[in-house]
């Protein structure tokens, strides 16, 4: 077996796995801010983020999609735009000034980045 530490292109997530991870990401974005007792506007922002991620995830071409019409290459580009928006949310005063909200935002951003970076976008098994 090839040594995984020497493989600079190690991408263990298939598009199907990425799709499932996106659903979990959306659930976390929709629920965790409420559990953290975040500001009502912050909760609403993350509910909108969650809805968007769920929507384009459910429409992307992977095994667990509800209606697979969006190619995964386009999905990747939407992910990158979405993650840019989440990064910018760190500067929003109601998030920046609340340690729990800021920590959640940075964790969500980190998880999203890892999910995108570890996905084998060229895997056409779906």
Across the structure, where does each feature detected by a protein language model lie?
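Short amphipathic, positively biased membrane-proximal segments
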Residues: 1-126
